[in-house]
From Swiss-Prot:
Alphabetized Gene3D superfamilies for the sequence: 2.30.30.30, Nucleic acid-binding proteins (2.40.50.140)
Source domain of life: Bacteria
Matches recorded under InterPro entries: Elong-fact-P_C, NA-bd_OB-fold, Rib_uL2_dom2, Transl_elong_fac_P/YeiP, Transl_elong_KOW-like, Transl_elong_P/YeiP_cen, Transl_elong_P/YeiP_CS, Transl_elongation_fac_P
UniProt family annotation: Belongs to the elongation factor P family.
Organism: Trichormus variabilis (strain ATCC 29413 / PCC 7937)
Protein name according to UniProt: Elongation factor P
Gene symbol of the encoding locus: efp
PROSITE patterns attached to this UniProt entry: EFP (PS01275)
GO MF annotations in UniProt: translation elongation factor activity
Keyword Transferase listed: no
Amino acid sequence: MISSNDFRPGVSIVLDGSVWRVIDFLHVKPGKGSAFVRTTLKNVQSGKVLEKTFRAGETVPQATLEKITMQHTYKEGDEFVFMDMESYEEGRLSASQIGDRVKYLKEGMEVNVIRWGEQVLEVELANSVVLEVIQTDPGVKGDTATGGTKPAIVETGATVMVPLFISQGERIKIDTRDDKYLGRE
């Protein structure tokens, strides 16, 4: 159990049978009446955002989350097969469980899997990945009227906007959080 006075961004709680992460909180002490904590919560499974108010000192169950380092070994049909780096057990996850970062997942990559009990809540990739450009238009000299970027398709199939000087076959570093080009590798 955790007190509402101990809420901080990133704390996970159990509310109505599902896991919610505290995004923001505000401790309010009105001149008249008792203090309360106004929170913004995000459902870890569905992504739904909720505004909820708790009485100051109210206790709620804290979610005990387990973070496991796993390695993506291969893809079989619509499922991705991962191996636990400590116990060497295999686990399977669907693309919907991995989320939109599946476009940067390649074989041999290590990820952190966040579990609550036996249920997988989310898959965390590294903040940046290095991938090879497999298709992009050649940059034409003097063609900078559009801001100097062009689309490029990387080895995992994701499309990223890159500078005009990037050519096919180059390895580039990409930020997985906002799909931005970070540099050559």
